[in-house]
Amino acid sequence: MEKTGITALLRSVFTKDEDFQRVLAHICHTVAKDGSHISCDDFVSRSFLSYVVPDVPLQSLYSDTKYFSDLGRDSMKVSLMKGYVEMERSGNKDFGSGCYVDSTPLPNDIDIPISALCSHGTGGCEMQARLAVCLDSASGLPVWYSLFSGNIQDMSTLMDEIDDAETSVGVSIDDLVLDAGYITKELITAYNADDRFVSFTGRMPARKGFPFRTLYHRCGGSIHQAKYFFDRNGHTYFGRRFEDVLFGKRVYLYVYIDRDRALSLGRSYRQNNRDEYEALSDKEKNWLEVKNGYFVLVSNIDSTPAETLERYFGRMDIESFFKTSKEYLSLLPLSKWTRETIEGKLLNDMISTIVYLKIRKALSGTGLSMSKLFGRASSLMCTRKKDGTVIVEEANRQVKEIFKAAGIKIPSSLDLEEFEESCLLKPRKKNMK
């Protein structure tokens, strides 16, 4: 965090020692707990971190409603995200000059206050909220986000989010990644009419006005031709591209069949619904063999089916970075969740995500996974002496190899006061020459 400038950024926003120490504790916990269910107070109490956050009562880190509420203020979000973009631009002037928008539904196990009743993609009506994220196209790092009710973005909501990102942190959106149910006549027309959007890719819904089933018939017998097959993540896909006009606009339609999924689910249906299956016509049986793996992407990018699918799925992976599981969110009493605490939790996770991605990038090429780094590194023990010196135990061979690969030198001891000064936890006592 110190090497990437994140520590200095946080210090510039959180000027009080206790506030700064508190945000460090929460971010370190979010990043380094590595999927475990350990609470923040337990995590800090068992680590070196407890030595450098002395102003924070450990028991207050368990639910910490005030922290998330304070972090959820709009001014805090703008200060942190704007400062982050400026920090990145100091080393890369093009950072944020081209971004794409992705989104993911949030679980409602904690009754998110702004959730709205909807049935989009759920198989029934339920309360949902959605998180839209703007990411820098070159680095994939998040630069802005918005939380809204329901599970479908209409055009006005989407434009508000885009304008908000441009106004608040000065990033420009030129690419849109849209998931199931997003492609509408209104959106297709707007994307083509607005020259800010260099590209867009979205999934075609199976409803009236769209050639969803027509494209299946258009493919005909080619769905069995090997020249249209390609492999991705252990699955074999049929993929074919068509150039066409949709709502008066020239677009590219990419027709896919996940052959493995279609075969598996088709077999399951036949085995469990034998009488119904036998009653189907030959055409209906043929459709049943592919329908569970069939989907269509709509884009204004002329590419190959394999490249388009990789681009679409690759940019849909953003939800994996956000820790919105029931286990973590339920640490706060349900009665304490408000719009501000939800926003604060998301901002905490956004900053943590940036830190996580930067660590992962630094490890690329070393052969180290994040889990291996945090798992092995956490076994290294230390003790603090009365004079403030921290004695670090002799690391075993495996731990030494981990730290060496990560480019980190293991000290035999360190001066706690000097460490706190170097990490901006305390002001320096003397001017540096």
Q: Regions from the language model: what does each represent?
A:
Residues E307-S335:
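Short amphipathic alpha-helical "interface-anchor" segments enriched in bulky aromatics
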Residues G124-T167:
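Electropositive, glycine- and tryptophan-enriched low-complexity nucleic-acid-binding patches
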Residues M1-Y100, T104-I110, C134-N151, V390-K433:
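Dynamic "connector" segments at or just before major functional cores
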